[in-house]
Amino acid sequence: MAFVASVPVFANASGLKTEAKVCQKPALKNSFFRGEEVTSRSFFASQAVSAKPATTFEVDTTIRAQAVDAKKKGDIPLNLFRPANPYIGKCIYNERIVGEGAPGETKHIIFTHEGKVPYLEGQSIGIIPPGTDKDGKPHKLRLYSIASTRHGDFGDDKTVSLSVKRLEYTDANGNLVKGVCSNYLCDLKPGDEVMITGPVGTTMLMPEDQSATIIMLATGTGIAPFRSFLRRMFEETHADYKFNGLAWLFLGVPTSSTLLYREELEKMQKANPNNFRLDYAISREQTDSKGEKMYIQNRIAEYANEFWNMIQKPNTFVYMCGLRGMEDGIQQCMEDIAKANGTTWDAVVKGLKKEKRWHVETY
């Protein structure tokens, strides 16, 4: 998932580069990937056809968690690495995560950063593809939402994961056009180096309230930040964080074969039925009560009263991530719900934004 954006500079970012403290490694509960148990980097090494020997990916038992308490300190890691001086990470895993016959290809990619690029759930990193554009200038960085918790997929604070869909389309002249960065990333092999910038972003950070209701609206690779949310909530055990609220994910995709992390999500939901609700909107396979294609807004409409009542509560937070086209349908749905409750959505969403309870990142 990629979008190009200007990156603002925030104060207090550099402190996280030098401050490090030893903490207990987070215990991973029910850790799995593509339905299999995951305990260390060696799992990913064994899954990747071109992976180097597992010894290359041994987990260091001394954990440095630079970003763990960032929000409590009032510090959010931002712009630690810039385009002029990126961090050089390495790909250690790159595998397809869509089913057979899926339209398009999406990969789960893991990079090492050896604790040098701390980040928080909801942030993004920049990737600079090698080479130059048609004008001979270096390629611009692309931003990708992070799909792993701050501790990475192995809980050792040394990796960062992305969900990347390969961009390919035919233009008006019948020429095949390939996205520069997405194709570069999807073609990486374990051991390949990659230029990383960031982290960036404060819009999609998780709320600190551990009893909050968190509603997540995602399409396609927009699932990335919510995978990081959910893994922090339900797969890691922390002395200072225990989620006991409600997480409700609406995931919109065209076909069942494009449900990213399906086994992972359903396993978490089954293990946490009182704290995690999961609803799919599969547009090419499902219809609503009116016989219309099932998009996220159609699924939300089925829970209109419940959804409305939830967002009236001060500890309910709504997050939206995915293709920009999802916004119009959800906007219309919310306007209809607000009207049925005697008000306007413009007034409601204005209040939600003021209270920092409505968060949108689309591309």
UniProtKB/Swiss-Prot annotation:
GO molecular function list: ferredoxin-NADP+ reductase activity
Transit peptide limits: 1-65
Transmembrane segments: none
Listed name of the protein: Ferredoxin--NADP reductase, cyanelle
FAD-binding FR-type domain location: 84-206
Record localization: Plastid, Cyanelle stroma; Plastid, Cyanelle thylakoid membrane
Protein's gene: PETH
UniProt cofactor(s): FAD
Gene Ontology, cellular component aspect: cyanelle stroma; cyanelle thylakoid membrane
Signal sequence, start to end: none
GO biological process: photosynthesis
Gene3D superfamilies: Nucleotide-binding domain of ferredoxin-NADP reductase (FNR) module, Translation factors
Catalytic activity entry: 2 reduced [2Fe-2S]-[ferredoxin] + NADP(+) + H(+) = 2 oxidized [2Fe-2S]-[ferredoxin] + NADPH
Principal subcellular localisation of the protein: plastid
Membership in a protein family: Belongs to the ferredoxin--NADP reductase type 1 family.
Residue sites binding NADP(+) per the record: S145, K165, T221, V253, P254, S283, R284, K293, G322, L323, E361
Known EC number: 1.18.1.2
Keywords: Cyanelle, Electron transport, FAD, Flavoprotein, Membrane, NADP, Oxidoreductase, Photosynthesis, Plastid, Thylakoid, Transit peptide, Transport
The organism's place on the tree of life at top rank: Eukaryota
One of the Pfam families matching this protein, by short name: NAD_binding_1
Function: May play a key role in regulating the relative amounts of cyclic and non-cyclic electron flow to meet the demands of the plant for ATP and reducing power.
Membrane-protein topology: Peripheral membrane protein
UniProt xrefs under PANTHER family: PTHR43314
Binding residues for FAD: R142, L143, Y144, S145, S163, V164, K165, Y169, V180, C181, S182, T221
